[in-house]
Amino acid sequence: MRRMLVIRWILAIHLIATQVFAERIKDIATLAGVRVNQLVGYGLVVGLSGTGDKTGTKFTEDSFANMLTQLGINIPPGVRLNSKNIAAVMVTANLSSFMKKGQTMDVNISSIGDSKSLLGGTLLLTPLKGADGRVYAMSQGNVVVSGISASGSDGSSVTVNVPSGGRIPNGATIEADIPNPFYYSNSLTYNLHNPDFTTAKRMSDAINELMGPGTAKAIDAGSVVVTAPKKLSQRVDYVSVLENIEFKPGEAMAKIIINARTGTVVISSNVIVKSAAVSHGNLVVSITETPVISQPNAFASGRTVSTQQSQVNIQQKNNRAFILPKGTTLKDIVRGINAVGATPADVISILEALQQAGALSATLIVI
């Protein structure tokens, strides 16, 4: 069994090298469970030079009092802790799936009160929790701040970058491992970045061709399930081969993305425009299609073929015109509109009108 598996891996590597104009599985899909997990915690930064939360910030005072109580220092009733050297902060971090206990990671520190700057501050021991409420890391250390703020007695102030936030490189120590299906599941699931039925089918076919029939199965447009080796010692090599398999994904749906605020228009390569005429302000866009019949010679073995010859004409009031080449694609229309000096707003309005008229064979998305 092990020998057959090694032979399949060698064959896979050989066939992968022969693929042309294809994409690797690792570039278009991610392995379920292999992800970044967000952690968050609430803490206190101390040691600030008078730039902490202002006196009267209730949650900062209560947090500081609770911390002192936990350290065995009793605060007399009614005594207020007035200190501008403390700031309440949120601590965030990203925990990778395969990081282990004892390893360290960077954390981000952000003030949640009215602190002016965290420069020179030290974060006190703060637990970092995941979405399940469990503590996965503990953070503490000196805050590195890239911004600075200064103010004068007359009220004038200067601020460079953002002094109310910072980072602690390697400021958190991992205390618990993230549960990962990679270790205990009988199968591995790949999730496509852009769900597509054709891509999922081709991906499963490519895996089955190289690793054996029945190894992979596309369960929907976004997921492909692959049988995993039972021995954990074989899974790393197995996934290494899988993620480098190359195949040709399915063509993306015809889409037009419009950013109405910036005037940006992004058009996919397979967008086609049907016969239509659009008038917008002082612009007139005409699209015509003429049938062209190709008739074979007498006694020839060919057959009659009918095709469409398209022509686009764009005019302004000053009689400027722009004739586009044959074949009406949206790229040709946009190029022609731009040639006569149309604004991005004109382009967007014309595209929306074409879509409403049913002349645009694409999905129009406005962001």
Curated annotation (Swiss-Prot):
GO terms for biological process: bacterial-type flagellum-dependent cell motility. HAMAP family: FlgI. The basal body constitutes a major portion of the flagellar organelle and consists of four rings (L,P,S, and M) mounted on a central rod. It comes from the Bacteria. This is Flagellar P-ring protein. One of its GO terms (cellular component) is outer membrane-bounded periplasmic space. Residues 1-22 form the signal peptide. Belongs to the FlgI family. Assembles around the rod to form the L-ring and probably protects the motor/basal body from shearing forces during rotation. Disulfide bonds: none annotated.
